[in-house]
Amino acid sequence: MFILHATILTVFPEMFPGTLGYSLAGQALHKNIWSYDVINIRDFGLTKHKNVDDEAYGGGDGLIMRPDVLGSSIDHALSLNPNAEIYYPSPRGRVFTQSFAKEMLKNKNLIFLCGRYEGIDERVIEEYNVKEISVGDYILSGGEIPTLTILDCLIRLLPGVLMNQNTLSSESFEEVGEFKGGLECGLYTRPEIWRDRAVPSVLLSGNHRLINEWKKEQSRIITKLRRPELLKDL
């Protein structure tokens, strides 16, 4: 029985599962830890050309995805996934973070509405209480890549996906564990010396207390240099 189910609305259904069919996410998909279905918005398009967009009222550049077309596709998605939360990747949405990912997983049924063109009609957001979600302060061509990104993060958090679930607590942005919401320290493996660069001696000492102290201090230094706004919570 799957733990997470995602319904994806898109005009490019062939983009899924995409990268989610590989590595950890792909293995979890085959194990039925998560599942998905894709709905082609064009199946609900108008005229023989299956149009899904139209010109914007009030002028402006770009075309807008029509509310009647999106409404029909969302209604169909809700018939398959009735208790789902609906998310719309959008640059004006709440910024996606590790803590937001955990919050999203309180509902194991999710619908992702992948916009295209200039965006979607605002009335769709109002009608279905759609939650807008942003993956950063930049613009992409559509919502498919953000959806893949968000799902990859969510899937890693599901029980049974990682061989060692404790790995999560030692990663960047985790609120519990070694780095307390900061950035992860540098990582090292064999060989011990590479191009005259040596592994820090403390990591070879076998002294777990000193190693943990070193990791925490390195995390603090890296976080201060690269993401100082995270330190307020450390």
UniProtKB/Swiss-Prot annotation:
Pfam families: tRNA_m1G_MT. Homodimer. It comes from Rickettsia felis (strain ATCC VR-1525 / URRWXCal2). The gene is trmD. Specifically methylates guanosine-37 in various tRNAs. Keywords: Cytoplasm, Methyltransferase, S-adenosyl-L-methionine, Transferase, tRNA processing. Belongs to the RNA methyltransferase TrmD family. It catalyses: guanosine(37) in tRNA + S-adenosyl-L-methionine = N(1)-methylguanosine(37) in tRNA + S-adenosyl-L-homocysteine + H(+). It is an enzyme of class 2 (transferase). GO terms for biological process: tRNA N1-guanine methylation. One of its GO terms (molecular function) is tRNA (guanine(37)-N1)-methyltransferase activity. This is tRNA (guanine-N(1)-)-methyltransferase. Gene3D superfamilies: 3.40.1280.10, tRNA(m1g37)methyltransferase, domain 2.
